[in-house]
């Protein structure tokens, strides 16, 4: 019997993910591609559990890192595009057990937790469990100091994310990008027509934004281009900031996208996701 394979695609038609299955579980090499066709991830599975060397690459094709798993046991990692560690966590036979840490792309620790058999626990409980079960990852070193849970931290996290998008080379002011495409396809998120996308962008400018940017434009066939998110620059005037959020809220109401942050925290840009 032939092994079933699930495939998904990016909006530009580029293959996104290939997942081989056996008895409904991942079995074989799972591969994920960036929108530009470059291989992004390669993970080896056996009967639903990671088993073997897993690797991650940047959009430019640079190897960001790799790790080895043995039947669902090991330390899994992901990396930011700039090469810094993004996520690190331990699993034992597929269940979270051990330290779970998450970093921003500026290197700051965003969160750190301890898991035991898939649930978060205190350090004391985990150490006691380790004394009884030698298969659990040892707790070594000191606990980190994640960023405090404050509005200032929320703003910092958002601004770091915005800066990473603004650093993209394949960005453009969205109105010019939509209008200068000629007969070639210019597709913005879930808008079915370019004219509808332009109406929305014009509403943002009318509300008071000074710039609407498509930060991650990617190519398709025959000159087609696609964008799945926007950055909306916010003015300092409170009334205009509220008006812009009101326009974005209509987008969410029509199920054409979502925006962040959901409340004003003094951010420089709103992020609109339309994927």
Q: Locations of the language-model features?
A:
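Glycine/tyrosine- and acidic-biased, solvent-exposed loop/turn segments at the edges of beta-strands
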Residues: 1-139
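A general secondary-structure signal for short beta-strands and their flanking turns/coil
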Residues: 3, 225-227, 267
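Generic recognition of long tandem-repeat/solenoid scaffolds
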Residues: 26, 96, 228-233, 269-273
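Short amphipathic beta-strand and strand-loop transition segments with alternating hydrophobic
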Residues: 90, 213-221, 257-262
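Short intrinsically disordered coil segments
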Residues: 130, 245-249
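Long, contiguous N-terminal structural blocks used for assembly/anchoring
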Residues: 135-235
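Short, conserved charged micro-motifs
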Residues: 237-246
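Acidic, proline/glycine-rich low-complexity IDRs
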Residues: 249-275
């Amino acid at each position: 019997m032939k092994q079933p394979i699930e495939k998904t695609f990016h909006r530009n038609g580029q293959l996104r993910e290939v997942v081989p299955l056996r008895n409904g579980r991942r079995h074989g090499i799972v591969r994920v591609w960036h929108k530009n066709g470059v291989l992004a991830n390669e993970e080896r599975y056996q009967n639903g559990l990671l088993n073997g060397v897993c690797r991650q690459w940047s959009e430019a094709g640079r190897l960001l890192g790799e790790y080895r798993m043995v039947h669902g046991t090991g330390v899994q990692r992901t990396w930011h595009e700039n090469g810094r560690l993004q996520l690190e966590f331990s699993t034992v036979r597929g269940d979270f057990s051990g330290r779970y840490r998450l970093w921003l792309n500026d290197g700051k620790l965003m969160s750190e937790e301890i898991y035991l058999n898939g649930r978060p626990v205190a350090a004391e409980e985990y150490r006691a469990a380790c004394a009884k079960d030698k298969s659990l990852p040892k707790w070594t070193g000191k606990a980190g100091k994640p960023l405090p849970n404050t509005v200032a931290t929320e703003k910092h996290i958002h601004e770091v994310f915005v800066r990473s998008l603004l650093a993209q080379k394949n960005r453009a002011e969205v109105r010019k990008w939509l209008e200068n495409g000629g007969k070639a396809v210019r597709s913005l998120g879930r808008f079915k027509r370019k004219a509808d996308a332009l109406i929305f962008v014009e509403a943002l400018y009318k509300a008071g934004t000074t710039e609407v940017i498509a930060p991650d434009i990617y190519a398709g066939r025959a000159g087609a281009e696609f964008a799945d998110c926007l950055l909306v620059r916010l003015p300092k005037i409170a009334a205009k900031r509220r008006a812009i959020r009101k326009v974005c809220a209509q987008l969410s109401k029509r199920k054409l996208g979502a925006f962040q942050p959901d409340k004003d925290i003094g951010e420089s840009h709103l992020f609109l996701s339309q994927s």
